[in-house]
Amino acid sequence: MTLAQFGGLFVVYLIGTLFVLTLTYQEFRRVRFNFNVFFSLLYLLTFYFGFPLTCLLVFQFDVEVVPVEFLLYAILSATAFYAIYYVSYKTRLRKRSVQPRKAVFSMNRVETHLTWILLALVAIVTVGIFFLQNGFLLFKLNSYSQIFSSDVSGVALKRFFYFFIPAMLVVYFLKQDLRAWFFFLAATVAFGILTYVIVGGTRANIIIAFSLFLFIGIVRGWISLWMLVAAGVFGIVGMFWLALKRYSLDVSGPEAFYTFLYLTRDTFSPWENLALLLQNYDKIDFQGLAPIVRDFYVFIPSWLWPGRPDTVLNTANYFTWEVLDNHSGLAISPTLIGSLVVMGGALFIPVGAVLVGMIIKWFDWLYEMGKSESNRYKAAILQGFCFGAVFNIIVLAREGVDSFVSRVVFFCLIFGVCLLMAKLLYWLFDTAGLIKARVQRSRTLTPPASSVRADGLL
């Protein structure tokens, strides 16, 4: 990359960044937080944050990168995608209804507590089983790629670990005070560190827990935008340190700075992967919707499907194995736009942008319903579900549509099963006569009738 090429690329990058950043900031000032703001920040991080890091690697360390023309295509496609997404998100297909909707379900105190307990048990039990089978992998494996080898058993259990976070979210939304906020941080980060050590370097739970803590603080007004930026810098440094431990790296001086640049870029902003995919566009045999179906294979136990393929050819694996001919053991993320290109080429980019706009709009609709819900227990469940889906939106932006669809369906299924089990347990307790009236104490000798609620569990 020459300085002239860098100058032209920088102008295009600056226009795209300012475009996305301006729309995001306007939305932030209007609502402080919704899922459009979250997705937009995540989108900026994924497709724009890595450009300065790439330039530093090129000019400071003479690192070879994708040809400039494909870097340009990556920036242009990212900006065009966001423009279409934003129009899709803001377009209202029907008039706003002024009549209240009929409630689909209701929640009481016991059902809500049973729900978060079941969600937490799903995570804790699966972590325990994984530990009994493998021990502390962080101290046993020589390289991170060994996590995906046949030597590690029960890999599918890792998908259940995340449910500890929505469980703690429900606990927080029942109280919504500073004490509950810090309890959420302490509990989820501690659990994330535990899974980091057991699984052998997986940082997802720590990143998500810290991110949710910050966004809850933004929503409640407990932290400012500048505090969020400072916390983001702290988070980047923390993730770099964890990455050094995960890959057993011991670096110092210029090598440490070089390692920081490429690890931070690959962790938070794999935008060069999109440029690399576009460079190999002629090698792609468009997969259609098959990667979405294939990504569900990992959720099917081998005892239920004896002939299940050992390898899943989703868009990430197709990009890694078929396009790049890379068989190192790690899948290279194609990003959201890259997954659309693998499935249907450039024509799938605007179609995907429209669909993503509708998906984010649905999450915002559900989130607003939770905020306006008068039943505090139902509100906690709805908001816990929405914030719990943050991981799936991260997967959408970073890994692609196919991974998002399979994970969001899995998340909804497990969350729904726990909710139904909680209602079933409540019905059984009530039938057995274990549910008694919960009488709230009052300073007066005769408490008012409203202080009696039939939702206590002895």
Curated annotation (Swiss-Prot):
Task: List, in alphabetical order, the GO biological process terms annotated in this UniProt record.
Answer: enterobacterial common antigen biosynthetic process
The metabolic or biological pathway listed in the UniProt record of this protein is: Bacterial outer membrane biogenesis; enterobacterial common antigen biosynthesis
The coiled-coil segments of this chain are none
Report the principal subcellular site.
membrane
Write the record's keywords in alphabetical order, separated by commas. Cell inner membrane, Cell membrane, Membrane, Transmembrane, Transmembrane helix
Q: List the disulfide bonds.
A: none
Which is a Gene Ontology cellular component entry for this protein? Answer: plasma membrane
| Localization of this protein | Cell inner membrane
Which regions span the lipid bilayer? 3-23, 37-57, 65-85, 112-132, 154-174, 180-200, 201-221, 222-242, 340-360, 377-397, 409-429
The record gives the membrane topology as: Multi-pass membrane protein
InterPro entries according to UniProt: WzyE
> What biological function has been recorded for the protein in this entry?
Probably involved in the polymerization of enterobacterial common antigen (ECA) trisaccharide repeat units.
Quaternary form? Probably part of a complex composed of WzxE, WzyE and WzzE.
Describe the family membership recorded for this protein in Swiss-Prot or TrEMBL.
Belongs to the WzyE family.
This one is known as: Probable ECA polymerase
Q: Which organism is it from?
A: Serratia proteamaculans (strain 568)
> Which gene is transcribed and translated to give this protein?
wzyE
